[in-house]
């Protein structure tokens, strides 16, 4: 149906859609004008009959309201409704801001159609989008689908989230920002103007440069925001204020409480997780018409974890989470523990020193506590060192190595220490395994005159004890097993001095007492049994004792108890076969000491065995302290040994005050 221009009947004018601007030609009003309307709905099919538009009767004022449109066909009504309602924001929120933050050059006016009587649709329409694309790409920044509101030649693509909030919504701020759910009890602060602007701009940057890192995007956004003028920032400031009010409605009791930043190490800093504007790029082909999957302001809502892309526009943790979800277990653990096999751990293995230190290792510094051999337990080594000087003991290893066959009596089959079976089990790869066999091949030295002076010093303490089980080398100290402590041994009379600290007897080293173990039958079961050899190091101990003899002058019986220095002889050194009492000269008093009592020498049966004698009838005087007094006409200095006076807990300085002895002068040696 074609309307003629000179039609006499008056038809009602066309009702315009809000936001459109009618274009009136600058010709005479009598001629009809063709109106071009920009539409977003699909173009009609080719076989459909084009509907006619009645001519527009201009009024003197262009802003006059047109009259209502007459009734049309159902197809025409559907087309008009699609053209009138293009976005829910235009209806739901009449106060939707028309922002002009980014003014663009006005589009070139579309060419008007010729002066024909028929109205044809514009040929500049975009291809009709699909329903899923219409629902999923309502954000204003999607290319090719911008919703334009033409008003006075200014185009704008800004539609904020506050315009999409339903009137009766209980969560208006969450609906406006489409924020994701956080941990329970955590409420995010309302977005400021920069966050509103950067959320929309980030989406555009990610579309142009999808490989750009988040940190670089943030720097670029900050630089651009500083370059914007106040007028350009005004729409975002208004939107931020609206979001703040919506935030107050949703969270009425919210109060911002900033928390102190925790000090973190550089390696523990989490990557930036602000990737809301870089997502949902791969969701455009999803045929989901639900409103919960709408992308508003460049963000996505439901199902975002399963639809993350691996673009670097997103946070660095997204790709890491995807790698973890893929089941990749090829990563190395944080700590690697190196475990040794059971064959490498053997508690019975002992690493022996080299060949030059083997003798010194066994006889000078260390003592074998339990040295076990084969099943017969036939040979043992009892290395009980004597109490000789320390400086002579350092050369013991070399001496024993040179003259060992002399002490063994020339028996080539004897061995020192552990038997060959135990040596082969404990030290199979040691090059010193055959050292003992080579020592036995040395010819014995039977003539003692050929021995050096150094060897002769050790002969009194060495004993060759031949037995049926074999030869045993014993290095014993005098009376080691008889008494817990030894008698002092003086070298000569010249070495006796008054100061006990300077005497060699005060510098004696206590003998090493080995922890001897017997070989029982269960410990020596078979040839294949190997036992762990234990060694013990006994540190030398030095006991220092100062003895001061105070001899006061005068007294009641000073007439017959006055002695001179020439009346005394030097106290000789006690030999091994002499009495244990060092007071053995003719002019010295024959007084012995037993416990805390003085006894006469005639009552002493054996001076070396005080504990086995009975001195009940011979006790001169008994004292329990250190001030000892003895009634004796032949009084002299009482020399007490280390055994006679054990160390007292009060100290090592012992003072003996013999008030009963009267001397003409102090006696000093």
UniProtKB/Swiss-Prot annotation:
An annotated Gene Ontology molecular function: sequence-specific DNA binding
DNA-binding region: 187-255
Comp. bias (Basic and acidic residues): 130-145, 322-336
Span list, region Disordered: 1-149, 254-336, 419-439
Composition bias, Pro residues: 52-71
Subcellular localization: Nucleus
Gene3D superfamilies named in the record: High mobility group box domain
Principal place of residence: nucleus
Keywords, ordered alphabetically: DNA-binding, Nucleus, Transcription, Transcription regulation
A GO CC annotation given for this chain: nucleus
Any single Pfam family the record assigns to this protein: HMG_box
Biased composition (Polar residues): 1-12, 75-84, 295-318, 419-431
Classification via SUPFAM superfamilies: HMG-box
InterPro entries noted in UniProt: HMG_box_dom (IPR009071), HMG_box_dom_sf (IPR036910), SRY-related_HMG-box_TF-like (IPR050140)
Entry superkingdom: Eukaryota
GO aspect biological process, one term: neuron remodeling
Annotated Low complexity bias: 17-37, 88-105, 284-294
The protein, known as: Putative transcription factor SOX-14
Organism: Drosophila melanogaster
